[in-house]
């Protein structure tokens, strides 16, 4: 049995968008599930679209995601070079062989001649398919034009194909009328191969067993197969995958400002969570399990569970999954992950490890950290209506009573190095005051944070702030509440 070999063959045109990354992941999983090889090949034949530094982005992204390649431009292998522009002389030779085999021909037509045919088709209301007169030229006529230095492209020759079909692992048997296939360009006038032709040659040369790509290539595959057949080569196994959609009507697209992998990481999503989530875009495991490590995905991945239907990218689902990853981290890994964000957000003399602990159950993405902990450095001029809480049964009057009592208690409290002792101290207060826990703890939390939503409760926040700052903030609350409560009493 031949070894399973897949390839990820991106063009160096910028950032890695989610659809591309999902294709790379599927290719990686197909190969690794079968104990095979995953190759990286750079397809840079379209020199106009090439972006400086984009190859490094590809390397960096794949490494961050754990998609380590077995062969590629940087590490070599038995089938290199792995950059198409470094393989240029080879393609021309293969194209000339294909001409001899009757699968291709020289085309000397000008853009004007092609455009004239297009306009004629439009005027007749029929779909345009270029009917190339050059394929009827004799060998002598072709040679005379070549000797005269006429510019040319090499086109695929398609004739008398009739009904043709191929089998796809996802979409099953695909039948196509050969008469609708157009004679695509294989070698451009600048000598560069087109993406379509270079792909076929490279896949064969590199012994790629499974070609994984977007379902938009289903319609081109019969043309590829004619080339495989003309050379007498074995066709690869085709795995066409559905698109990743922004919504029911729009594909995810970097051009439309949709998030790339780099954008998501910059927003505070974890590479492992992103990979887990995109594995489930268009593929479903046999169980209800949703959280998978890459190694677990390798074990359970099955081509036949790839869906034919488009997958919709749901940022809320990714956010939820990212939160699960953050909460499942061991203490040390988690702290090292959030520390840069905490150092940026908190500059006061506070224990960042303690802050990290209280935010772990409450954040889903790393970029939520700054906003959730900004009150440690600065107590804002908050709305006093926050002291009014129906569920907690608090009003400004109740809050003022609670804050005055808590200030007195905390001034006498001297075990600020123990969260448990502080917990015991503050939870004893409601009983003494014959109040409910929330009637005391909600006002304290409001006073020490100035926020309606905080990553921790009153006791946790007070413990991190320490005695002096906690008492200062409670006094601010007392002073401000005294003004409105007294005003109410006067009226």
Which functions belong to the PLM regions below?
Residues 6-12, 39-44, 206-211, 259, ...:
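Glycine- and acidic
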Residues 55, 275, 331-339, 403, ...:
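An amphipathic alpha-helix signature
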Residues 1-123, 221-233:
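N-terminal Rossmann-like or analogous alpha/beta NTP/dinucleotide-binding catalytic cores
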Residues 390-420:
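Long, amphipathic alpha-helical coiled-coil segments characteristic
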Residues 17, 27, 58, 98, ...:
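Residue-level signal for inorganic ion chemistry
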Residues 97-100, 105-106, 110-240, 246-252, ...:
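Active-site cores that bind ATP or allylic diphosphates and position pyrophosphate for catalysis
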Residues 419-465, 469:
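Helix-rich, typically C-terminal accessory recognition domains appended to large enzymatic cores
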Residues 231-385, 393, 449, 453-491:
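Catalytic adenosine-cofactor/nucleotide-binding cores of aminoacyl-tRNA synthetases and other
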